[in-house]
């Protein structure tokens, strides 16, 4: 899966993964990240999610990373924000209202960029990637996060043979494999969501579960 794939999806407005509301799991479980006002939370592969503005409204310092320049520009325009724009370490950096978005390759992100980060929130990053890239993504994320970080992870699972991703199925066993070393994993929620996901119903998927995990390092 190459960068051109995602650029084309955004250019053609093929963004069924984008939610027109703040993610309910985030609203229910943000407190589990134990973040204080002003502390930084990372949102990898963030798109133009409304979760960014909601997190900032909770008093947090929000750092998003997104490949698509269109997604980043759309986020600020749709939220009525005029960002300051500059270059930083190969990223195009947009800043406004407590939100910093780094437009560029997530795999170019380094530990120095996250020195002040306390937690991460992943709703649409891990499930956006095919298996080989998921392993690389999880490894890179863990390599650059500070010690004692916390994370909130949302996944989906379904019979992968019944539908081609993205979004891809990420079963519980895979989550635990990716984060086996040095992380405590707590499943916060799991439920059947097939009935409210028409895309999966249309494609004949026989079952669909969503799960939410709290990840604690150290």
From Swiss-Prot:
GO molecular function terms listed in the Swiss-Prot or TrEMBL record: thiopurine S-methyltransferase activity
Gene3D superfamilies: Vaccinia Virus protein VP39
EC top class, as a word: transferase
Keyword terms, alphabetized: Cytoplasm, Methyltransferase, S-adenosyl-L-methionine, Transferase
Protein EC: 2.1.1.67
Coiled coil segments of this chain: none
Entry binding sites for S-adenosyl-L-methionine: 10, 45, 66, 123
GO BP terms: methylation; response to metal ion
Alphabetical list of InterPro entries matching this protein: SAM-dependent_MTases_sf, Thiopur_S-MeTfrase_Se/Te_detox, Thiopurine_S-MeTrfase, TPMT
Catalytic activity reported: S-adenosyl-L-methionine + a thiopurine = S-adenosyl-L-homocysteine + a thiopurine S-methylether
Location(s) in or outside the cell: Cytoplasm
Major location (coarse): cytoplasm
GO cellular component terms listed in the entry, alphabetical order: cytoplasm
Ion transport among keywords: no
Record-stated family: Belongs to the class I-like SAM-binding methyltransferase superfamily. TPMT family.
Record-linked NCBIfam families: PRK13255.1, TMPT_Se_Te
The name this protein goes by in its record: Thiopurine S-methyltransferase
Protein species of origin: Pseudomonas paraeruginosa (strain DSM 24068 / PA7) (Pseudomonas aeruginosa (strain PA7))
